[in-house]
């Protein structure tokens, strides 16, 4: 791919992000796995919220005795915090302040992304009910009779995303009556993606292996071919009306590791900064990382 074509894709991708993705003022830092592991790393959510807004936050969700909890595994033990306590009540002061100030041009302040580790219907229904408790905070859209007709968002301080499983669509979309509010929005199936965004499926969620198939630990230097794959994916997603997220790009040493997955690690700041630069220039809407502070610093104007 020639540099002029890459430059054109950068401009067109960014423009599409601004036009079609007006409710996510991206690119955004996406705080990956932003919850405790086995009682450790309990400061992750506070760290993410301290970096300023807007920000995206991932919460992995499982089930324990009838309640949604945040957990990296479906094998819950009862020590996991509830989704309600860990996330919703933690952000309550921020949401109430935002509603009082009513600075709608700055909304959403937080994009929360649920990664369900368990798809049993009672869990999904519990989360739907939980979202109903906090609906005044939540960006919604009316269900249309035709899924291909996207209704406008009623933008609030919080936008809720979930992933691609059809089991989720059955509860979060199919059971909702036409004209009623959708409280969260799923991702599209990315395999052989050709369909445009629907009223429910508004984003796409790619593993970084779609860009560098060898995976982060085995990746070599960032290349023109890698850049071309990245821009092709972003351009296609935006052209079909989707927001786009990539997971997960890290670059840390053993001494820096705070319970992070080695499978996402390029091994150095230099290596991950090259990828972040490319993601920012390509107009990726949600850039997932475990190194919240490092990416936040890199994203500051002038960096």
Task: Give residue spans per PLM region.
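Phosphate-group recognition and catalysis centered on beta-loop-alpha active-site segments
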Residues: 18-303
């Amino acid at each position: 791919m020639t540099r002029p074509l890459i430059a054109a894709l950068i401009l067109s991708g960014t423009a599409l992000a601004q036009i079609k993705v007006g409710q996510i003022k991206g690119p955004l830092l996406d705080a990956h796995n932003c919850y405790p592991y086995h009682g450790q790393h309990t400061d992750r959510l506070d760290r993410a919220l301290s970096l300023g807004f807007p920000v995206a936050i991932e919460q992995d969700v499982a089930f324990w005795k009838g309640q949604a909890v945040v957990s990296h595994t479906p094998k819950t033990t009862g020590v996991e915090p509830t989704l309600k306590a860990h996330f919703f009540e933690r952000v309550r002061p921020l949401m109430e302040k935002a509603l009082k100030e009513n600075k709608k041009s700055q909304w959403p302040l937080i994009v929360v992304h649920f990664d369900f580790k368990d798809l049993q219907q009672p869990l999904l229904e519990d989360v739907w009910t939980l979202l109903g408790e906090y609906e005044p905070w939540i960006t919604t859209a009316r269900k249309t009779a035709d899924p291909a007709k996207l209704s406008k968002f009623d933008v609030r301080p919080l936008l809720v995303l979930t992933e691609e499983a059809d089991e989720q669509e059955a509860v979060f979309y199919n059971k909702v009556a036409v004209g009623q509010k959708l409280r969260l929005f799923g991702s599209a199936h990315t395999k052989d993606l050709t369909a445009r965004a629907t009223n429910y499926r508004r984003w796409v969620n790619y593993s970084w292996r779609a860009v560098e198939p060898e995976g982060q630990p085995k990746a070599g230097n960032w290349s023109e071919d890698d850049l071309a794959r990245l821009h092709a994916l972003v351009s296609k997603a935006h052209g079909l009306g989707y927001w786009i997220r990539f997971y997960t790009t890290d670059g840390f040493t053993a001494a820096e590791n705070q319970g992070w997955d080695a499978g996402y690690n390029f091994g150095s700041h230099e290596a991950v900064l090259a990828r972040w630069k490319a993601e920012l220039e390509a107009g990726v809407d949600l850039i997932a990382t475990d190194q919240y502070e490092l990416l936040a610093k890199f994203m500051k104007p002038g960096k």
